[in-house]
Amino acid sequence: MRRFLTLLAAASAPTLMDGASAPPDTRRHAICILYPDNSTVRGMVSFSQDSITSPTKIACSVRGLNPNGKHGIHIHQFGDLSEGCATAGPHFNPHNKKHGGPFSEERHVGDLGNLTSDPFGSAYLCFADKQVSLYGEHSILGRSVVVHAKEDDLGRTDHPDSKTTGNSGARVACGVIGLSKDFKIVPPFSD
């Protein structure tokens, strides 16, 4: 009997790890530590989702940005940072939508909008998102967060990159999204 239970647990592990069969009331947390990529930008992004059907709380704290500016922030397809942020791939877009803002009707799942930096180059952002999920086949776990050098135009301009990347420029920081024991509160940096 003990051997049967061990085998049953082993067979169930991959399914539970991907979140597809997780109980609906299992709260999940994730964290992404942002590292500079040819810049001084660094920070942390925390995620928390109470259940498969609830929105995901997202809190970002970033420093080293250009002061008093807007900087695009997105979830990208891959967690592969073997060649820096360049190998993170495109925005996470499992539904093949056009680029938009975090509250646009049409958008990539990975479209998180803009960070707005203060005079010291620090930014703090906190909101809830109904498309970002820590569960199932479209989970963001193992993917990456990328901060960009310029403002994301949210798909609202005639620039050729507007509907795909928001014309948000170079990738200045990135990190891989991984499971976390709890929701890390990311206070604003104090310089």
Regions found by a protein language model. Give the residues of each.
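N-terminal leader/targeting pre-sequences
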Residues: 2-191
